[in-house]
C-alpha cells in the first residue's frame, strides 16, 4: 500500500473548515455562532449526542458509581478551546474516552471484588458462629455412654444446622447476584435498542445525502453514474460546492457519532467481559490482531504512548487483539496520516473498508474513509473529480452501516440467548436450593439415626463382650461355621442364576409375543372404532324414534281438540232441537185452540189462520228435518273420530312399548360396548407396559451389541499382535539362515586351512555337522510351527467370517425389526423417563450403562474408521445410507462375532498352541453369560474392565519371549479377569446425574466443552462442522442460515448421499431448504421450519433456527 504526502497548504484548510465544524457540533449550545458558509447543526445530531452522553452516564453508574461528569466537562472544555488547532481536539477526545473506559472498567472490577469480599466475610462469620456454638455445647457433655450419645447428637444437629444456614446464605447470594446480572443485561438490551434507533437515523441521513447529491441507487456503479455526475458538476459548479460542504458537515457528524458508538460498544464489551460473556469467539485473537495490523502498519512511538491508557485497560479486560487495541491503533493511524492527500491513499482506505469483517466490533474499528476526505474533496471538486470521492465515501458509509447493523443483530441475538440461559439457570438454582434444603433435612434425620445406630452398636458390642466372657468362664467352645456360610452363598448364587435364566426366557417370550400384541392392539383399536360407529348409529336411531313419538303426540293432541269441537257442536245442536220441540208443542197447542175457535167462530178467518199455520208448520218441519240430518251427520262424524282416536291410541301404545323395548336393547348394547371398551383400554395399557419392557430389552440388546463390538476390537488387536509375532519369527528364521551360511563358510575355511590335522579336522567336522543338524532341526521345527500358525490363523479367519456373516446378519435384522416396531413408543418412554426421577430400577441402570458406554473413546478408537462412517462405534441409520454405502458398511459389520459363538470356544486351554491360546485368552475378556445376566451384575462388573484388559495386554507383550508353560499359567488366570471385565468404566452417581442432565439438555455438555453460553457453544460447533465448505460463514442463527447452504453443509457431513453439495447454489433457496429438510426427515428429525417463510425472509427467527440445529446436534452427537 503506497502512502503519499499531502501538501502543507492543505493543513490550515483542514483546521479552518473541518475541525471547527466538529467543535461546533460537539457543542450544541453554541450552534448559533457558526461561521459563514457552514450550515448550523441539525437537531438530530444534537439529540444523538445527548443520548450517547446519557448512555455514558448510565454505564458509569452501572459499573460502580464512578462520577464521570468531570471527564465530560473536561471533554467539552478541551473541544471548545481547541478550535484553531487541528490535531488537538481529536487527541483530547480520544484521551478522555480512554480515561472514561479505564475508569468504568476499574470501577467495575472494584465493585465485583468488593462483592466477593463481602460474600467471603459473611461466610467466615457464619463459620465462626457455628464453631462458637459447637465450643459452647461441647463442655456440657457429661460422662457415660448416654452422655456421649447425647453429645454426638448435638454435634450432628449443630453441624447440620450450620450447613443448612450456609446453603441458604449461598442460595440467597446467588439469587441476588442473578437478579443484579439480569438487571444489567436488561439495561444493555435497552442500550442496544437505542443503538438500533441511531443506526436507522444514520441510514435516513444517508438517504437524504443521496437525494441531495442526485445519486440514484439503481445507477451507483458503472460509467453512466460518473457521466451523469460530471454533467451535473459541469452545469452547476456552485451547487456542487454547497452540497459537498453539506456532505462534509454530515460526514463529520457521522464520524463523531461513530466514535461515540465505538466508545459505548467498548464499554458494553468491558461490562460483558466482567459478567463472563465474550463477543470475540468468532475469530481467533491472533488472526484479528494480524488483520488489523495490516490496516494500520505505520504507528509511531509517540502515538502509541498516547493510547497507552486504552491499551492497559484492554489488557485488563480482554485478550490481545481485542477492541481496545484496535481502537488505539485506529486513532493512531488517523493522527499519523492526516498529512497525506493522494488519491492512492483514498482508494487504499476504501478497499480496506470493503474487506470482510466478522466480529461484532470490526465494523466500528475499521478506519473511516471520511476523515481523509475533508479538504482534498474541495480541491477535487474545483478540479472536477470531487464526485467520485463523495460516491466512494457514501459507498463506504453504506457498507459500514450495513456491517454495523448485522453485528448489532448478532449482539442482540446473543444477549437474548444469554437472558434465556440466565432465566433457566435461575430456575435450576431455585430447584437446587430446594433440593439442598431437602437433603439437609434428610441429613439431619440420617445423622440422628446414625447416632442411634452407633449407640445400639456400642450396646450390642458390650453385650457380645459380656457373653464371650461368660462362655470363656464356662469353657464353652464357639466356632463360626464358614462352610454353612459358603453353602448359603452358593445357594443364593444358584438361585440368582436360575432367576437370570428365567428372566432370559421371559424376555425371549416377550420378544416373540410382541408382534402378536401389536396385532391384537390393532384389532382392538379396529373393534373400538366399529363399536363407536355402532353406538353412533344406535343413538341416531333413538333420536329418530323420539322424533316420531313427538309427532304422534302432536297428532293425538290435534285429534283431541277436534273431538272437543265436535262435542261442543253436538251439544249446541241438541239444545236447538229441544227448543224446536218446545216450539212445536206450542204450535200444536195453538192449532188445537184454532180448531176449537174454528169450530166455534168464523170459518174464513180460521181458514186464513190455518193456512198461515200450515205454512209455518211446513217450514218448521223442513227445518226440523234438516236439523235431524245435521244431527245424524255430526253423530256419525263423532263416532268415526272416536274410532280413529281409539286406533291411534292403540298404535301409540304399541309404538311406545316397541320404543321402550328398543331403548332397553340399546342400553344393554351400550353397557356391553362400554365394558368392552374398558377391557380394550386395560389391554392397551397392558400392551403399553409390555412395549416399555420390550424397549428396555432392546436397550439391553444395544448394550450387548456394544460389548460385542468392543470384544471384536480386542480380537482384532490380538490378530495384529499375532501378525507381529509372525513377522518376528520370520526375522528369526532369516537370521538363522544367515547364521547357517556364516557357519558353513567358516567350516569350509577351517577345512581348507586345517587339512594337515586330520583328527582335529574330523572332530571339528563332526561337531559342525552336529551343530548344522541341530540348526536344521530347529529350522524345520520353526517352519512347521510357522505353517501351523498360518493355517490356524486362516482357519480362524474363515470360521469367524462364515459364522459371523450368518449370525450377525440375522441378529441385526431381528434387532432392526424390533426397533422399527417399537420406534413409535420410544418418544413416550423417553418423555416418561425424563418427566420424573425414577428409583434405580433395571431400566435406569441399563440406560445409564448405555449412555456411560458412549463416553470413553479409548476403546472405540481401536476400530478402524471408514470414510463413510461418521463416528466410531456408530452405524448410520438405514435411511441415511445409500446402497453403495450399505455395501461398504456390511463388510465391517459382518466381521463382528456374537457372544454365543465366542463363548462356545472357551474350551480346554491345554490342547491349544501358544498363539491360539493368546487369541482365546483375549477373547475371554468378556463374560460369556452377559445376555443372561441382568443390568445389576453388569453394573457391578463394569469397574475393572479397562484395567484388566490393559494388564492382560501388558502381560501378553511381556510374555512373548517366555516359555509356553508361563503362557499356559497366564491363560489359566485370564478367565478370572474376564469374569469381571466390561467395555465401560464405573458409573458413579455424579456421571449418572450428568448423563441425565445431558439427556434433558443436550447443549450443556457442548457448553462445558467449548466454554461460554450454550448459544455460542452451538455456534462454534456449527463453525467447526462446516469448516472447508465454500460460501459458508456462520456468525449467528438468523442471517447466516437464510439461503439454506449452512443446513446443507451441516447435514452433508453426516448424510453425504442425500445432499449433492457441489451442485447447490445460494440463489436457489427453496431447493436448498427442501434438500436439507428432506435429508433430516429421512433419519427421523422432524422439520419445525417453514420452507416458504425461510426462503422469503432475509433474517429468520433465530430461536426457531437454533432449536432445529439443536435437534440435529442431539440426533447425531448424543
Swiss-Prot record:
Listed Gene3D superfamilies = Calponin-like domain (1.10.418.10)
Chain positions with Phosphoserine modification: 385-386, 390, 869, 882, 888
Q: Where is the composition biased (Polar residues)?
A: 93-117, 133-145, 294-304
Recorded superkingdom: Eukaryota
* Calponin-homology (CH) domain: residues covered: 1012-1117
Classification via Pfam families: CH (PF00307)
Keyword terms, alphabetized:
Cell cycle, Cell division, Cell junction, Coiled coil, Cytoplasm, Cytoskeleton, Gap junction, Phosphoprotein
| Summary of the function given for this chain in its UniProt record | Involved in cytokinesis and spindle organization. May play a role in actin cytoskeleton organization and microtubule stabilization and hence required for proper cell adhesion and migration.
Keyword flag GTP-binding: no
InterPro entries tied to this protein: CH_dom, CH_dom_sf, F-actin_Monoox_Mical
Query: Per the record's keyword annotation, is Coiled coil included, yes or no?
Result: yes
Coiled coil (UniProt feature): 168-281, 395-450, 488-808
Give the principal location in a single coarse category. cytoplasm
Q: Where in the cell is it found?
A: Cytoplasm, Cytoskeleton; Cytoplasm, Cytoskeleton, Spindle; Cell junction, Gap junction
- Quaternary assembly: May interact with both microtubules and actin cytoskeleton.
UniProt lists the family membership as follows: Belongs to the cytospin-A family.
Biased composition, Basic and acidic residues: where in the chain?
A: 120-131, 158-171, 947-957
Supply one GO molecular-function term: beta-catenin binding
Q: Give the protein name, as stated in the record.
A: Cytospin-A
Q: Where is the composition biased (Low complexity)?
A: 80-90, 359-373, 972-992
Task: Note the SS bond partners.
Answer: none
Gene Ontology CC terms: actin cytoskeleton; cell-cell junction; cytoplasm; filamentous actin; gap junction; microtubule cytoskeleton; microtubule organizing center; spindle
Region Disordered: list its residue ranges: 1-63, 75-176, 294-324, 359-391, 921-999
From its record, what is one biological process in GO terms? cell adhesion
Amino acid at each position: 500500500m503506497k502512502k503519499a504526502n499531502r501538501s502543507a497548504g492543505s493543513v490550515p484548510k483542514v483546521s479552518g473548515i473541518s475541525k471547527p465544524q466538529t467543535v461546533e457540533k460537539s457543542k450544541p449550545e453554541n450552534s448559533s455562532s457558526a461561521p459563514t458558509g457552514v450550515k448550523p447543526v441539525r437537531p438530530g445530531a444534537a439529540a444523538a449526542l445527548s443520548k450517547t452522553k446519557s448512555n455514558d452516564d448510565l454505564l458509569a453508574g452501572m459499573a460502580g458509581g464512578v462520577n464521570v461528569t468531570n471527564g465530560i466537562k473536561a471533554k467539552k472544555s478541551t473541544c471548545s478551546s481547541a478550535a484553531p488547532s487541528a490535531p488537538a481536539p481529536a487527541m483530547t477526545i480520544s484521551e478522555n474516552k480512554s480515561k472514561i473506559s479505564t475508569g468504568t472498567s476499574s470501577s467495575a472490577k472494584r465493585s465485583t471484588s468488593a462483592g466477593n469480599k463481602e460474600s467471603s466475610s459473611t461466610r467466615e462469620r457464619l463459620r465462626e458462629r457455628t464453631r462458637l456454638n459447637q465450643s459452647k455445647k461441647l463442655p456440657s457433655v457429661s460422662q457415660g455412654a448416654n452422655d456421649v450419645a447425647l453429645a454426638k447428637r448435638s454435634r450432628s444437629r449443630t453441624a447440620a444446622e450450620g450447613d443448612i444456614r450456609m446453603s441458604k446464605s449461598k442460595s440467597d447470594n446467588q439469587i441476588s447476584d442473578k437478579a443484579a446480572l439480569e438487571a444489567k443485561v436488561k439495561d444493555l438490551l435497552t442500550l442496544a435498542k437505542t443503538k438500533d434507533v441511531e443506526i436507522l437515523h444514520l441510514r435516513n441521513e444517508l438517504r437524504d445525502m443521496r437525494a441531495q447529491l442526485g445519486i440514484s441507487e439503481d445507477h451507483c456503479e458503472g460509467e453512466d453514474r460518473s457521466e451523469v455526475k460530471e454533467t451535473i458538476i459541469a452545469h452547476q459548479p456552485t451547487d456542487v460546492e454547497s452540497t459537498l460542504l453539506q456532505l462534509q458537515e454530515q460526514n463529520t457528524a457521522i464520524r463523531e457519532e461513530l466514535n461515540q458508538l465505538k466508545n459505548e460498544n467498548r464499554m458494553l464489551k468491558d461490562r460483558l467481559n466482567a459478567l463472563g460473556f465474550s463477543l470475540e469467539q468468532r475469530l481467533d485473537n491472533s488472526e484479528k490482531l494480524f488483520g488489523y495490523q495490516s490496516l494500520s502498519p505505520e504507528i509511531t512511538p509517540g502515538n502509541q504512548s498516547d493510547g497507552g491508557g486504552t491499551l492497559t485497560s484492554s489488557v485488563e479486560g480482554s485478550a490481545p487483539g481485542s477492541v481496545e487495541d484496535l481502537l488505539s491503533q485506529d486513532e493512531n493511524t488517523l493522527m499519523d496520516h492526516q498529512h497525506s492527500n493522494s488519491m492512492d491513499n483514498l482508494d487504499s482506505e476504501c478497499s480496506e473498508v470493503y474487506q470482510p469483517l466478522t466480529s461484532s466490533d470490526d465494523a466500528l474499528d475499521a478506519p473511516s474513509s471520511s476523515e481523509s476526505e475533508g479538504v482534498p474533496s474541495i480541491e477535487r471538486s474545483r478540479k472536477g473529480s470531487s464526485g467520485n470521492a463523495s460516491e466512494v465515501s457514501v459507498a463506504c458509509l453504506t457498507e459500514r452501516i450495513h456491517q454495523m447493523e448485522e453485528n448489532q443483530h448478532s449482539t442482540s441475538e446473543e444477549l437474548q440467548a444469554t437472558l434465556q440461559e440466565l432465566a433457566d439457570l435461575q430456575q435450576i438454582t431455585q430447584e437446587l436450593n430446594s433440593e439442598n434444603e431437602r437433603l439437609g433435612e434428610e441429613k439431619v434425620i440420617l445423622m440422628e439415626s446414625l447416632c442411634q445406630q452407633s449407640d445400639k452398636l456400642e450396646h450390642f458390642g458390650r453385650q457380645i463382650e459380656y457373653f464371650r466372657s461368660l462362655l470363656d468362664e464356662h469353657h464353652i467352645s464357639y466356632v463360626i461355621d464358614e462352610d454353612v456360610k459358603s453353602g448359603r452363598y452358593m445357594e443364593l448364587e444358584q438361585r440368582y442364576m436360575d432367576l437370570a435364566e428365567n428372566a432370559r426366557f421371559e424376555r425371549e417370550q416377550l420378544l416373540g409375543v410382541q408382534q402378536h400384541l401389536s396385532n391384537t392392539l390393532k384389532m382392538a383399536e379396529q373393534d373400538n372404532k366399529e363399536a363407536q360407529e355402532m353406538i353412533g348409529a344406535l343413538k341416531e336411531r333413538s333420536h329418530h324414534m323420539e322424533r316420531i313419538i313427538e309427532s304422534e303426540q302432536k297428532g293425538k293432541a290435534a285429534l283431541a281438540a277436534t273431538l272437543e269441537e265436535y262435542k261442543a257442536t253436538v251439544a249446541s245442536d241438541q239444545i236447538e232441537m229441544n227448543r224446536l220441540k218446545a216450539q212445536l208443542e206450542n204450535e200444536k197447542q195453538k192449532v188445537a185452540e184454532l180448531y176449537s175457535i174454528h169450530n166455534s167462530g168464523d170459518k174464513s178467518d180460521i181458514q186464513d189462520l190455518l193456512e198461515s199455520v200450515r205454512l209455518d208448520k211446513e217450514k218448521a218441519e223442513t227445518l226440523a228435518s234438516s236439523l235431524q240430518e245435521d244431527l245424524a251427520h255430526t253423530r256419525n262424524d263423532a263416532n268415526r273420530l272416536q274410532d280413529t282416536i281409539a286406533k291411534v291410541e292403540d298404535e301409540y301404545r304399541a309404538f311406545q312399548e316397541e320404543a321402550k323395548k328398543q331403548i332397553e336393547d340399546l342400553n344393554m348394547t351400550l353397557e356391553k360396548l362400554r365394558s368392552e371398551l374398558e377391557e380394550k383400554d386395560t389391554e392397551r395399557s397392558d400392551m403399553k407396559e409390555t412395549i416399555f419392557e420390550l424397549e428396555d430389552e432392546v436397550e439391553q440388546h444395544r448394550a450387548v451389541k456394544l460389548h460385542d463390538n468392543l470384544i471384536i476390537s480386542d480380537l482384532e488387536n490380538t490378530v495384529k499382535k499375532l501378525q507381529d509375532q509372525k513377522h518376528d519369527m520370520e526375522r528369526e528364521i532369516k537370521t538363522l539362515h544367515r547364521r547357517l551360511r556364516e557357519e558353513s563358510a567358516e567350516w569350509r575355511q577351517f577345512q581348507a586351512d586345517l587339512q594337515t590335522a586330520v583328527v582335529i579336522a574330523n572332530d571339528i567336522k563332526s561337531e559342525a555337522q552336529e551343530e548344522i543338524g541341530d540348526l536344521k532341526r530347529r529350522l524345520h521345527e520353526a517352519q512347521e510351527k510357522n505353517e501351523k500358525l498360518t493355517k490356524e490363523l486362516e482357519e480362524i479367519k474363515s470360521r469367524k467370517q462364515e459364522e459371523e456373516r450368518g449370525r450377525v446378519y440375522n441378529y441385526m435384522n431381528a434387532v432392526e425389526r424390533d426397533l422399527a416396531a417399537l420406534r413409535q413408543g420410544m418418544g413416550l418412554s423417553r418423555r416418561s423417563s425424563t418427566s420424573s426421577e425414577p428409583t434405580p430400577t433395571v431400566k435406569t441402570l441399563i440406560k445409564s450403562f448405555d449412555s456411560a458406554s458412549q463416553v470413553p473413546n479409548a476403546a472405540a478408537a481401536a476400530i478402524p474408521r471408514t470414510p463413510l462412517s461418521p463416528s466410531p462405534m456408530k452405524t448410520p441409520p438405514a435411511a441415511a445410507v445409500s446402497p453403495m454405502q450399505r455395501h461398504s458398511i456390511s463388510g465391517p459389520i459382518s466381521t463382528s462375532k456374537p457372544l454365543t459363538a465366542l463363548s462356545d470356544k472357551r474350551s480346554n486351554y491345554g490342547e491349544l498352541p501358544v498363539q491360539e491360546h493368546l487369541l482365546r485368552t483375549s477373547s475371554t475378556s468378556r463374560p460369556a453369560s452377559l445376555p443372561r445376566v441382568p443390568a445389576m451384575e453388569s453394573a457391578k462388573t463394569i469397574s475393572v474392565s479397562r484395567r484388566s484388559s490393559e494388564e492382560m495386554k501388558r502381560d501378553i507383550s511381556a510374555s512373548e519371549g517366555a516359555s509356553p508353560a508361563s503362557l499356559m499359567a497366564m491363560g489359566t488366570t485370564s478367565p478370572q479377569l474376564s469374569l469381571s471385565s466390561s467395555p465401560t468404566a464405573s458409573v458413579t452417581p455424579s456421571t449418572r446425574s450428568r448423563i441425565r442432565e445431558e439427556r434433558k439438555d443436550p447443549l450443556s455438555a457442548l457448553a462445558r466443552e467449548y466454554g461460554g453460553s450454550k448459544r455460542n457453544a452451538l455456534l462454534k460447533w456449527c463453525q467447526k462442522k462446516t469448516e472447508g465448505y465454500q460460501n459458508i460463514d456462520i456468525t449467528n442463527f438468523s442471517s447466516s442460515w437464510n439461503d439454506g447452504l449452512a443446513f446443507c453443509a451441516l447435514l452433508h457431513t453426516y448424510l453425504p448421499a442425500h445432499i449433492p453439495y457441489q451442485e447447490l447454489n445460494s440463489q436457489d433457496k427453496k431447493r436448498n431448504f427442501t434438500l436439507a429438510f428432506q435429508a433430516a426427515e429421512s433419519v427421523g428429525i422432524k422439520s419445525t421450519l417453514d420452507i416458504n417463510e425461510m426462503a422469503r425472509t432475509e433474517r429468520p427467527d433465530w430461536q426457531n433456527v437454533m432449536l432445529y440445529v439443536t435437534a440435529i446436534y442431539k440426533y447425531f452427537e448424543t
